[in-house]
């Protein structure tokens, strides 16, 4: 044991004699490891945030979304605002037919658009969520002031509106908004509620949105009878897959679709959505981590070159140590330990920097109202350190072997 510690001490002393080279190498490794930690933390944090939102729906929910045949549904606020797709085939009558299926318990449909909201002299562009009144049974729609609109108000096409927290502050400041009238497309809406602040989710600023009944949006603003999607909950969760297939068959029949590739809708259970999100985020995190890992491997080649130059520069030292009794394996271990110590120190420093940067990203996201999770797992820290030390071992083997091969007589003669 003492022999091992003496070898480590000797390796440290040798590295301290080359402070500039040691510091630069440690910093280079630290930057790579820090990048790896930040990427893994950001990926895990974002995945946790999205999954926590999806879990609010429960495992008994089926989602139906419109899409262009052969393509995926719209997934972000930027796509929505650019009008990437407008499918008009999913009608109110389709939703009613789905609701009539024997295993469907509750449901709501939705349509989303952009409008200018006005109150006295204030005006602002907002995302308008035409949501069914039953949406409160599915989503985390928490009311801070007032209430959410009722099913009766939706059925009567009542001009009622629920404001996001930021919109309420913009239009009314500290004044009470409940009962006040705001305008969308010159149609007056009575404010019945104000949402609690939720931050941003998947590109949507949830606090800069307003909610009105689906039918109200269709009839009073858009003059349409189609929706963008719907969610249904089932009575018997054991039959959820069967109900999903019934919905698919029903919509294909109503839309006259024979080829599944021509589906203008997508039906997924919430469990499938959660699994898909996990796969997508895990894949993105893995790909980015591989890119960083490649850069670290390139850094390992640099360490090999540095250590090889060090062997050449320290030929006399190696020869002298061999002459006074050091064995080949002693020389090999010294140079190998130097490479391992370099990468281990770089790994530890990188982990510390990575955790600090990840926490700063978390604080920055929170300050901008983005719903974000700070998540640095023990697994990612251990993996980063193991990868860092592995690079040191691999990078140090060749120069260490070359150092062990040095002939002591030739080394002393050259000096």
Language model segments and positions:
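Peri-transmembrane interface segments
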Residues: 244-247, 258-292
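Mid-to-C-terminal secondary-structure elements
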Residues: 134-148, 158-258
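Glycine-centered tight turns that cap/initiate beta-strands
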Residues: 100-106, 176, 226, 408
């Amino acid at each position: 044991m003492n022999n091992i510690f003496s070898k480590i001490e000797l390796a440290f002393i040798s590295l301290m004699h080359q402070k500039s080279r040691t510091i630069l190498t440690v910093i280079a490794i630290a930057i790579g490891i820090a990048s790896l930690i930040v990427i893994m933390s950001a990926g895990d944090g974002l995945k946790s945030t999205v999954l926590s939102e999806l879990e609010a729906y429960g495992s008994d929910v089926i989602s139906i979304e419109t899409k262009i045949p052969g393509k995926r549904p719209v997934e972000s606020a930027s796509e929505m605002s650019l009008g990437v797709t407008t499918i008009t085939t999913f009608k109110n009558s389709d939703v009613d037919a789905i609701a009539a299926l024997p295993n469907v318990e509750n449901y709501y449909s939705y349509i989303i658009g952009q409008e200018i909201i006005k109150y006295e002299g204030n005006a602002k562009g907002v995302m308008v969520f035409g949501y069914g009144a039953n949406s409160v049974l599915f989503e985390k729609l928490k009311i801070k002031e007032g209430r959410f609109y009722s099913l009766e108000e939706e059925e009567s096409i009542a001009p009622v509106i629920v404001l996001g927290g930021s919109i309420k502050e913009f239009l009314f400041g500290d004044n009470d908004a409940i009962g006040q009238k705001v305008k969308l497309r010159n149609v007056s809406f009575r404010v019945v509620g104000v949402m609690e602040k939720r931050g941003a989710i998947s590109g949507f600023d949830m606090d800069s949105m307003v909610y009105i009944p689906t039918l109200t949006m269709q009839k009073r603003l858009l003059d349409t009878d189609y929706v963008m999607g719907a969610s249904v909950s089932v009575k018997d969760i054991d039959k959820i897959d069967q109900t999903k297939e019934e919905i698919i068959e029903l919509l294909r029949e109503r839309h006259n679709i024979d080829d599944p590739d021509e589906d203008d809708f997508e039906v997924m259970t919430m469990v499938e959505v959660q699994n898909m999100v996990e796969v997508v985020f895990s894949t993105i995190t893995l790909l980015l981590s591989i890119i960083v890992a490649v850069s670290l491997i390139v850094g390992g080649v640099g360490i090999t070159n540095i250590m090889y130059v060090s062997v050449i520069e320290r030929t006399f030292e190696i020869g002298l140590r061999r002459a006074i009794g050091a064995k080949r394996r002693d020389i090999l271990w010294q140079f190998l330990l130097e490479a391992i110590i370099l990468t281990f120190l770089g790994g530890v420093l990188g982990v510390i920097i990575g955790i600090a940067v990840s926490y700063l990203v978390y604080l920055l996201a929170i300050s901008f109202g983005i719903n974000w999770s700070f998540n640095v797992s023990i697994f990612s820290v251990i993996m980063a350190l193991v990868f860092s030390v592995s690079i040191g071992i691999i990078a140090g083997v060749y120069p260490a072997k070359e150092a062990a091969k040095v002939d002591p007589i030739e080394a002393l003669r050259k000096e």
